[in-house]
Amino acid sequence: MLITKNNKKKIKKISKRGTNKAFLQKLLSVEKLTNLLKKKQRKVSLARKAQKKIYHKGKFKITDIISIPLRGEVIKRIIKPKLQGIDLVVDEMDHNPINDIEILFYTREQEEERRQEEPEDYPLDAWDKDVLGIVSEDEPQYKNPTDFIYHWEFGILHPVASFEEFFEIDFNHVALHKVDSYGDFAFYGNDPYVKTFEYPTEQYYISEEDAGQFEIDYLLHYSTKLERHSQYLLKRKENYNPKQPQILETDSRSEHYLMNYFYYNKLENVLEKKEGIDDAEVYKFIKLDFGEKMELKLEKFYDLNRERRFRVKKLSQSKLYEFEKAALKGIGFDCFMLIVGIIIFLASSPYLFSQLPWRVKYSLHNTWYHNLLEVIDVLFSMPKVINLEWLYLQAMWEGELTVLKIRGGISVLTAIETIMSVMSNYKDLSQTSQIINYLANFSFDIY
C-alpha cells in the first residue's frame, strides 16, 4: 500500500492498534475488494449510459418476435412453399380415379382389400421397390396412441417421429455443408430444400450409357417421392392439428416445427379450394411486431419519402417547363429574325441591284433574275383559275364528253386546243402569264 495524503489517517489508526501481519493483510484485501467493486460500478454505469443512448437513437432489442429474433430470413425461405409443387399435387389428385374424401376413412384392412381388387387405382405399386421404397410399412412410425403425428409437451408441439424418419433423410447421402456443427440438419443456405440423392463425381462417369441410366434413376426417385408424399397427406389429412405451434426455441428444431406447420396448413387450404387456384399468392407469413416506436418511425420514414418524391417531381416539372419556355423563346426569336431579314432583303433588292456593276447586272437581267420575276408573276396569277374542274376537263379531253356548247358557239375542246397551241408558241414567261389570265377570264363563261 502506497503512503499518500489520503492514507495517512489509516496509517495512524494502524499504528495505534498495532502492526500485526494478519491485520495488515486483512486490510489490504478489503481495499482490493472495494476497488474492484468501484470498477464494476463504473462499468455498469457506462453500460447503462450506452444503452440509453442506443435506446434514444432507435436501436431496440427485438423482443416481440415469435421467439426467433435472429433467423427471420431463414424462416422466410423455409415456410414459403412454391405453387408449382402444390399445383402438381392438385393435378395428380384430379387425375387419380380414387375418391379423395372416401379414402380418408379407409382402415388399413379396407385399403389392402382395395389394392387387391382394384390395382389400377394404385399405380405406385407397379414401380420397382428399389426406386420407390416401402412406404406402407413405415407409416405406423408416424402415429402415436391418439392417432396424431404431433403431441404436446410442456406447451410445445413435438412430432412423434424423429426428424430423420419423418422426412426420410439418410445422412450418409447429405453433403457436409448442409449439416450444422451441432449435427442438426441445416435448412439455411443457397438451397433450402433437402437433397437426399446427389450426382456422383466425375470419376464415376464411366460411359454415357451409365450416366444416362443414373439420370433416369435420379428422375424416378424424385417423381415417385412427390407422388408418395401427396398420397400420404391425403390419407392422413384429418390428423393434422390446426392449432398454431407455440415455439419457444431458437435452434433448428423451431425451424422444423415452423416448416411443418406452414406446409401442412398451406396444403390443407389448397385441397379445400383446389377449384379456385389462380396465380394469386395465398401464403401464410409470420407477422413480426417491432413495437409502437418502430412503427411510428416507419410511418415517418414513409411520409418523408413521399414528400421527397413529390418535391423531386415538382422540381423536375418546373425545370422541364423552364427548358421548354426557353426553347420556344429561342425558336420564336429565330423565326422573327428570319422574316425581318427576308423583308429587308426584298425591300432593298432594287437598290442593291442598281449598285451592281453593269456587266453583272446585264448577265443577271438576261438569265435567272429576269426569269425569277416572271415565275413569281405566273405563281400569283394561277389562283385566278378557280372555276375550271380539272377532272371534268380531263374526261372531256379523253373523248367522253365532246359536244358541250358554251356561249359564242365554241366547244370547250376547241377552246382548250387553241389555248394550248398559243401557249406552245410563246416561250416567254410573261406571255404565258397573260394566257393564264385569259384562261381564267374565259372559264367564267363555261356552263
UniProtKB/Swiss-Prot annotation:
Cellular component annotations (GO), alphabetically ordered: mitochondrion
Location within or outside the cell: Mitochondrion
One of this protein's GO BP terms? sexual reproduction
- Broad class of where this protein is predominantly found: mitochondrion
Q: Say if the entry is tagged with keyword Mitochondrion.
A: yes
Which keywords belong to this entry? Mitochondrion
Q: Which domain of life is it from?
A: Eukaryota
In its UniProt entry, what is this protein called?
Answer: Uncharacterized mitochondrial protein Mp05
